[in-house]
């Protein structure tokens, strides 16, 4: 199994009552087929807006690490330890957990 066609998706309930959708998977590009991409991104959406999209150091085959990243982000956002911003999340995306 890989992240190609199988992104990791989590939902965080933010302290202010909003929900954040967390996705760790292959970057979505309408011009390039999923199988031709290997860039794994961390994407956080709050409401209908994109709060952060960050390239990670992960490969498509690192499903367990992607799941761990999504869980860490979910838990951090839910607790208020992390803000749903690129600045707050990029340190997690830059490491293999």
Could you tell me what each predicted segment is?
Residues 2-10, 79-97:
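Short, charged, intrinsically disordered terminal tails
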Residues 61-78:
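A short, charged, amphipathic alpha-helix used as a generic interaction element across diverse proteins
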Residues 31-54:
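Short aromatic-glycine-(Arg/Gly/Cys) micro-motifs in beta-strand/loop hairpins
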Residues 1-28:
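Negatively charged, low-complexity tracts enriched in Asp/Glu with abundant Ser/Thr
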Residues 22-24, 40-44, 70-73:
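Hydrophobic beta-strand residues in large extracellular and virion-surface proteins
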Residues 23, 35-40, 61-66:
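Mixed-charge, low-complexity intrinsically disordered regions enriched for alternating acidic
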Residues 50-64:
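A short, exposed loop/beta-hairpin motif centered on an aromatic-Gly-Thr core
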């Amino acid at each position: 199994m890989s992240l190609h066609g199988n992104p990791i998706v989590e939902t965080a309930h933010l302290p202010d009552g909003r929900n954040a959708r967390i996705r760790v998977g292959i970057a979505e590009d309408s011009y390039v087929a999923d199988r031709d991409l290997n860039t794994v991104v961390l994407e956080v959406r709050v409401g209908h807006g994109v709060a952060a999209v960050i390239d990670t150091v992960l490969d498509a085959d690192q499903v367990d690490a992607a799941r761990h990243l999504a869980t860490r982000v979910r838990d951090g956002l839910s607790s208020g330890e992390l803000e749903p911003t690129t600045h707050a999340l990029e340190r997690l995306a830059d490491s293999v957990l």
